[in-house]
Amino acid sequence: MSLIGSEVKPFKADAFKAGKFVTVTDDTLKGKWSVVFFYPADFTFVCPTELEDLAENYAEFQRLGVEI
């Protein structure tokens, strides 16, 4: 489900970025284009396919200034 242009509700989550765990909040992403990706569980059909596509396009997202 795409929510392009939508504001996120306040949240706080741990993420693994650049080889370390970081805390991400709605304030962290404020004013930036962002992709927030959730999946139901490991070893489901969503995990390998969509995450692989996201990883393959990561450099392009970075080039466009998008936070993932």
Curated annotation (Swiss-Prot):
The keyword Translocase does not apply. Thiol-specific peroxidase that catalyzes the reduction of hydrogen peroxide and organic hydroperoxides to water and alcohols, respectively. Plays a role in cell protection against oxidative stress by detoxifying peroxides. It catalyses: a hydroperoxide + NADH + H(+) = an alcohol + NAD(+) + H2O. It is found in: Cytoplasm. GO terms for biological process: cell redox homeostasis; cellular response to stress; hydrogen peroxide catabolic process; response to oxidative stress. Its EC number is 1.11.1.26. Belongs to the peroxiredoxin family. AhpC/Prx1 subfamily. The active site is at 47 (cysteine sulfenic acid (-soh) intermediate). This is Alkyl hydroperoxide reductase C. It is an enzyme of class 1 (oxidoreductase). GO terms for molecular function: NADH-dependent peroxiredoxin activity; thioredoxin peroxidase activity. Homodimer; disulfide-linked, upon oxidation. 5 homodimers assemble to form a ring-like decamer. It comes from Rhodospirillum rubrum. Its main location: cytoplasm. GO terms for cellular component: cytosol. PROSITE patterns: THIOREDOXIN_2. The active site is a conserved redox-active cysteine residue, the peroxidatic cysteine (C(P)), which makes the nucleophilic attack on the peroxide substrate. The peroxide oxidizes the C(P)-SH to cysteine sulfenic acid (C(P)-SOH), which then reacts with another cysteine residue, the resolving cysteine (C(R)), to form a disulfide bridge. The disulfide is subsequently reduced by an appropriate electron donor to complete the catalytic cycle. In this typical 2-Cys peroxiredoxin, C(R) is provided by the other dimeric subunit to form an intersubunit disulfide. The keyword Oxidoreductase applies. Residues 2-68 form the Thioredoxin domain.
